[in-house]
Amino acid sequence: MMNIILKISGKFFDEDNVDNLIVLRQSIKELADNGFRVGIVTGGGSTARRYIKLAREIGIGEAYLDLLGIWASRLNAYLVMFSLQDLAYMHVPQSLEEFIQDWSHGKVVVTGGFQPGQSTAAVAALVAEASSSKTLVVATNVDGVYEKDPRIYADVKLIPHLTTQDLRKILEGSQSVQAGTYELLDPLAIKIVERSKIRVIVMNYRKLNRIIDILKGEEVSSIIEPV
């Protein structure tokens, strides 16, 4: 059995689309039927951004803003966990230690954020490392990695293959790791996938029904190789 971690962008939940959850459940079942063991990490999305914005406007400190974002991501994790029903272990871990313990039960484990100052991308990299997963799939609202945001710049082309060093260059000077902007791995997540030689696949969550083909390299996505 092959272990993989699926990081689901918070934008997946912003769409309020029940079909997203139905397709996600079907995709997880298909992965299990094809010999994959899956862990899932959820982002906080607009729920996190809304609470963070309100709290910041009344002067709440950054550590507490991080906690609001973490709890929003965990709310999304509960939604996914409940939608998976018997496929999932019925507990959302709040730390890496809890994730490892839950993972030992043999079912899908769904988690959100862990601690302030740490993105859910970094959490996904950490749990990939802890579960001995050699592939981390990042499902977001674009088809892969671009040099610039494809939703703003119509002429940019998808980069099908790149290294973590290439990704660092793309991220240099950008604001793409801030809430509400084009999402890629943050520097901490990159360091983790490099040290454990974890391959990263960036895909569009609207193509989750093709995830087996994406893992085989037969569908549009970006593959990031650790170096």
From Swiss-Prot:
Residues the record lists as binding UMP: 44, 66, 114-120
Keyword hit for DNA-binding: no
Membrane spanning stretches: none
InterPro entries given in the database record: AceGlu_kinase-like_sf, Asp/Glu/Uridylate_kinase, Uridylate_kinase, Uridylate_kinase_arch/spir
Keyword field: ATP-binding, Cytoplasm, Kinase, Nucleotide-binding, Pyrimidine biosynthesis, Transferase
Pathway entry: Pyrimidine metabolism; CTP biosynthesis via de novo pathway; UDP from UMP (UMPK route): step 1/1
Extra remark beyond the main annotation: Catalysis proceeds by a sequential bi-bi reaction mechanism of random order.
The protein, known as: Uridylate kinase
